Every structure is written in structure tokens, then in C-alpha cells.
From Swiss-Prot:
<feature type="domain" description="TLC">
    <location>
        <begin position="131"/>
        <end position="332"/>
    </location>
</feature>
<feature type="topological domain" description="Lumenal">
    <location>
        <begin position="1"/>
        <end position="40"/>
    </location>
</feature>
<dbReference type="GO" id="GO:0019216">
    <property type="term" value="P:regulation of lipid metabolic process"/>
</dbReference>
<comment type="function">
    <text>Ceramide synthase that catalyzes the transfer of the acyl chain from acyl-CoA to a sphingoid base, with high selectivity toward very-long-chain fatty acyl-CoA (chain length C22-C27). N-acylates sphinganine and sphingosine bases to form dihydroceramides and ceramides in de novo synthesis and salvage pathways, respectively. Plays a non-redundant role in the synthesis of ceramides with very-long-chain fatty acids in kidney, liver and brain. Regulates the abundance of myelin-specific sphingolipids galactosylceramide and sulfatide that affects myelin sheath architecture and motor neuron functions.</text>
</comment>
<feature type="topological domain" description="Cytoplasmic">
    <location>
        <begin position="325"/>
        <end position="380"/>
    </location>
</feature>
<keyword id="KW-0444">Lipid biosynthesis</keyword>
<keyword id="KW-0325">Glycoprotein</keyword>
<feature type="modified residue" description="Phosphoserine">
    <location>
        <position position="349"/>
    </location>
</feature>
<feature type="modified residue" description="Phosphoserine">
    <location>
        <position position="341"/>
    </location>
</feature>
<keyword id="KW-0472">Membrane</keyword>
<dbReference type="InterPro" id="IPR016439">
    <property type="entry name" value="Lag1/Lac1-like"/>
</dbReference>
<feature type="transmembrane region" description="Helical">
    <location>
        <begin position="41"/>
        <end position="61"/>
    </location>
</feature>
<feature type="short sequence motif" description="Last loop motif">
    <location>
        <begin position="291"/>
        <end position="300"/>
    </location>
</feature>
<dbReference type="GO" id="GO:0005783">
    <property type="term" value="C:endoplasmic reticulum"/>
</dbReference>
<comment type="pathway">
    <text>Lipid metabolism; sphingolipid metabolism.</text>
</comment>
<feature type="transmembrane region" description="Helical">
    <location>
        <begin position="304"/>
        <end position="324"/>
    </location>
</feature>
<dbReference type="GO" id="GO:0003677">
    <property type="term" value="F:DNA binding"/>
</dbReference>
């Protein structure tokens, strides 16, 4: 049965155009072709990426955070309370009013004290500013290097300037070492992101991020199997062109350099819109949808590849919506922040006031303490 499944999965009609077989893609005469077995190396490379990331965050990102004066807000910890902790872990982090009243009776605390306990407990679970900075630093470093390397891989190729040449001679297209390593490194990195997603900073688009990583891994793997390598290198470089800008904007945001963050974010938004909503659908997708049909009839691989490209395009539209919302806030003078991030709650949430007298009563609050001077912003 397993052999039958294996034979059906690797049936040439699924992966290759009509009248072509895997034998046509065997290495010969010094020409090397993409093979599925090449991708086995990406899993150990993904683990290597996780190790490199650990040491990078420890010995590079952490000192950089100190240099940029990335500071944590003081968080008041929720006092131990078995009753409230049990509810928090088993029933939910946001108790309804009826739950608050019940927990108040069970714990002997007032309703206001129960609400305060849950706010502090939720804040404890939120990732620290340093964790966010280190994660953004790692991704910025990879995406920047990947974009530079990817550009070097494709800039001297004829299909970079004439998309019809992407399919010239397809699928009998040999690969060169630079294409091989570009693919292996990109795929390994996305495997590492998928492996670490449970421990990384969780944002509101957590599910969309999982879909994106899975779709990207499938697309990169399939494009290698089916020898869509030329199209694949163009797509990967296009995606890397804006990602490093977003991560650098996050880094400056966490460091408190708001003007620099906002300026980089505007550049990122422009690059994202141009690459993901203009170049990708009207050039790259047109290239993968229209030009192949001029050479051979559509087959399963053709439909599958373009379907996955459509999934990515829908995610781009979703993220473009979030980006435009943030850009609108910037233009209208509001603070620009990551729309996907949860906001940290303060002790004054839901109208609660700190127990402080005199003029401090009406001052801004941070974790329940009046802020004496809230104007320490870096001047870029």
C-alpha cells in the first residue's frame, strides 16, 4: 500500500507536463537538475538556524538592545491566588462580569481586586520588550542578507528582465550552485520559523502567520520538485525586499525612536504595496498563469502552484489592509504601532484610578504609578 501511495504521489502527470518523465531530469553531461531528495538537508539546516538564532539573540541582539536603550516597563506581578489562577488556566483570561462576582465570593476579594489581578496576570504572560526586540533583530538580519544574496542570484539572469525566459526550455532547466543554496537556505529558514512559532511573540494574526509559513514551505518545496526554480527565485527575492524594512521599523519602535520608526514604516508600506499588490499579481502571477500555457497544456502542478500563489496573495491583501490602517494613523497624527500586537493593560484600565493623593491623582499611569515626566522621547 505504501508503495502504491509513493508511486501515485510521484506520478509524472502530477508534477510534469505531458510527455515528460523523471528520467528527462536526470543529471547528465555535467548539467544538474533539481531533485526532491535535495530538500532533506533543509530539516537539519532549520535546526542549525534555531541554534544560530539562540546565540545571535544572546550575544548580538541583547547587547544591541542595551546600546539602543531598550527598556522594560515595570510590571506588577499578580499575587498568588490558587482560586483565580485555576480559573485563569482552565476557563479563560478574560472573565465575564458573572465570573468576576463568583470569583470575588470564592476568593474573598472585591470585584475590583479580581479585575486588577487578572489584568496583572495577563500582563505577566505578555512577551517582554527585549524578547520582541531580539526576535525582530534576528529576522531583520536574515531578511536583509537573504534579499542581498537573492538579488545577486537573479540580477544577472536573462529571466530577471524578460519573464518569458522563465519558461524557456521548461522543464529541462539545469540549476547552478547559487540557486541551490538560495533555495535550501530560504526553505530552512521558514522551517525554523514554523518550529519556533509556538515560542515566538504571538500576535493577532497568529493563524494567518501559520498559514503563510505552511503555504511558503509548500510553494518552495513544490517549485523545487517541479523545477519551477526560476520563478521561485523571483518570488522569494520579491518577498524579501520589504520584510527587512518592517523588522527594522519594529526594532526602532521598541527602542523608542519613534520618528525613525515611522519614516521606515512609510518606506516599508510603499515597498510592500508595490511588490505584493502590483508586481506580484500583475507580473509574477501573470508569468506563472499565462506564459506556461503557451508551451504545454495545463497539468495538476500548474493548478496547484498557482492556487498556492493565490493563497499568498490573499494574505498579502489582508496584511496590506492592516498596513494601510497604520499608515492612516500616522498621516492623521496618531501613534503608529503594530496593529497585530496586543496592548499592555495598565492599572487604570476600565476606569480604575491609582490610590494616590493630591495632584498625582489625575496624572497618566504606568502599572498603577503616576508618571512624573512622560516626555523622555528620543530625538532622532
Amino acid at each position: 500500500m505504501l508503495q502504491t501511495l509513493h508511486d501515485y504521489f510521484w506520478w509524472e502527470r502530477l508534477w510534469l507536463p505531458v510527455n515528460l518523465t523523471w528520467a528527462d531530469l536526470e543529471d547528465r553531461d555535467g548539467r544538474v537538475y533539481a531533485k526532491a531528495s535535495d530538500l532533506y538537508i533543509t530539516l537539519p539546516l532549520a535546526l542549525l538556524f534555531l541554534i544560530i538564532r539562540y546565540f545571535f539573540e544572546l550575544y548580538v541582539a541583547t547587547p544591541l538592545a542595551a546600546l539602543l536603550n531598550v527598556k522594560e516597563k515595570t510590571r506588577l506581578r499578580a499575587p498568588p491566588n490558587p482560586t483565580l489562577e485555576h480559573f485563569y488556566m482552565t476557563s479563560g483570561k478574560q472573565p465575564k462580569q458573572a465570573d468576576v462576582e463568583l470569583l470575588s465570593r470564592q476568593s474573598g476579594l472585591s470585584g475590583r481586586q479580581v479585575e486588577r489581578w487578572f489584568r496583572r496576570r495577563r500582563n505577566q504572560d505578555r512577551p517582554s520588550l527585549l524578547k520582541k526586540f531580539r526576535e525582530a533583530s534576528w529576522r531583520f538580519t536574515f531578511y536583509l542578507i537573504a534579499f542581498i544574496a537573492g538579488t545577486a542570484v537573479i540580477v544577472d539572469k536573462p529571466w530577471f528582465y524578460d519573464l518569458r525566459k522563465v519558461w524557456e526550455g521548461y522543464p529541462i532547466q539545469s540549476i547552478i550552485p547559487s540557486q541551490y543554496w538560495y533555495y535550501m537556505i530560504e526553505l530552512s529558514f521558514y522551517w525554523s520559523l514554523l518550529f519556533s512559532i509556538a515560542s515566538d511573540v504571538k500576535r493577532k494574526d497568529f493563524k494567518e502567520q501559520i498559514i503563510h509559513h505552511v503555504a511558503t514551505i509548500i510553494l518552495i518545496s513544490f517549485s523545487w520538485f517541479a523545477n519551477y526554480v526560476r520563478a521561485g527565485t523571483l518570488i522569494m527575492a520579491l518577498h524579501d525586499s520589504s520584510d527587512y524594512l518592517l523588522e527594522s521599523a519594529k526594532m526602532f519602535n521598541y527602542a523608542g525612536w519613534k520618528n525613525t520608526c515611522n519614516n521606515i514604516f512609510i518606506v516599508f508600506a510603499i515597498v510592500f504595496i508595490i511588490t505584493r499588490l502590483v508586481i506580484l499579481p500583475f507580473w509574477i502571477l501573470h508569468c506563472t498563469l499565462v506564459y506556461p500555457l503557451e508551451l504545454y497544456p495545463a497539468f495538476f502542478g500548474y493548478y496547484f502552484f498557482n492556487f498556492m500563489m493565490g493563497v499568498l496573495q490573499l494574505l498579502h491583501i489582508f496584511w496590506a489592509y492592516l498596513i494601510l490602517r497604520m499608515a492612516h494613523k500616522f498621516i492623521t497624527g496618531k501613534v503608529v504601532e503594530d496593529e497585530r500586537s496586543d496592548r499592555e493593560e495598565t492599572e487604570s484600565s476600565e476606569g480604575e484610578e491609582a490610590a494616590a493623593g493630591g495632584g498625582a491623582k489625575n496624572r497618566p499611569l504606568a502599572n498603577g504609578h503616576p508618571i512624573l515626566n512622560n516626555n523622555h522621547r528620543k530625538n532622532d
